[in-house]
Amino acid sequence: VVESLKRHGRLTQIELAGSTGLSPATVSNIVKELTAAGVLHTSFTSRSGRRATLVALARRVGLVAGAHFSTRQLHIAIADATRTTVAETVVPLAPGHRHDAELDRLTLLLGDMVESLGGQISDLLAVGVALPAPIDPRTGMVSTPGLLPGWEGVDVAESLSARIGRPVFVDSEANLGGLAEAREATGRGATSSVFVRVGHTISAGLVVDGDLFRGVSGKTGQIGHVTIDENGPVCRCSNRGCLEMYAAAPALLALFPESEGMQRLTDLLAASDAGVSTAHRVIADAGRHIGIAVASLCNLFDPELIIVGGELAQAGEILIAPMRHALERSALAATGGLPEIVAASFGEWGETRGAITMALDHVSVDADVAARLA
């Protein structure tokens, strides 16, 4: 019952019976016992038209934290066991940031945030971290050289855990963005979904039945390094003509002369919103390139839903409509139709929420947690 609530969030007792395979009577007895122990909290709902008992983990079970190191920003959030955010902050990151300095900073910020809630860092049950690169689940390190130079060769989870004395878990930003959407938002009803993250880099997270598909070395979903032109420019991964060289933020900004002041992705988005035709065209062309790569991904994995997130997703249909058209032209036809392409629900906080979800997945409500509730 506890594992099902960690995975799905709030559920009615009937939904709990369905997700666990237990009888309604057994679920009712377990809920009563765990509610009395302070592990669960119950309330009433009529969301299905009938009055029902809604069950969730009790907030006092403890706190978990999520952190997302993107290319330019660090997002941090602390949530209770119901995934309700109780503190959050965003700080800028310098280009080419390195693990040592940034993990030191994250340690200080986590301590300050927990103290502002009247606690201490030891109150955190677990911490999840999202990084802008694939992570090898066997080693905990960046799996591909060149994608995140300042973080290579480091077991980030182990390094941060040594600083804060709490369990830490690490995955890629695309995986965790996809996990958040699949568990809590747009992809919740889908049996399989792909979260395509488009910003300073391009990558994808594949989710099947609510669980991530990572591959042997964590490189699943690296569509930013699908070859678009084998004679194209050299990519940071050392290959030529990768999708990122045509559709990621650095490539898009490089299309404008310095005199136009397109220094950041926010400049491009603002220009597009203001109706600047060249900005609109650049984003639309990026969407077309990405859509062609997504079509290949669909031919390989046949997902039910495509969810688009990341910084460039703020362009909305200017980006997504060309993706949709490219998918229709390039993907194999299916009797049930092609997967729907939709915008992500969580915006800039999706990857952080996914990190929180991953952290909560690893929390065991055992004797130690029960002792906190006594």
State the predicted function of each range.
Residues 85, 89-192, 318-329:
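Glycine-rich phosphate-binding loop and adjoining helix at the ATP-binding site
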Residues 134-137, 175-178, 203-204, 213, ...:
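Short, active-site-adjacent cap segments at secondary-structure transitions
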Residues 190-246:
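Glycine-rich phosphate-binding loop of actin/hexokinase-like ATP-binding domains
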Residues 54, 64-68, 124-128, 193-197, ...:
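Short glycine-aspartate micro-motif
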Residues 42, 168-172, 206:
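General beta-strand structural signal in soluble alpha/beta enzymes
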Residues 80, 137, 207:
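Short, acidic, Ser/Thr-enriched surface-loop or helix-capping motifs
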Residues 131, 172, 198-200, 249, ...:
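Short secondary-structure boundary segments
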Residues 2-45, 51, 56-122, 186, ...:
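ATP-binding/phosphotransfer module of carbohydrate and carboxylate kinases, centering on a glycine-rich
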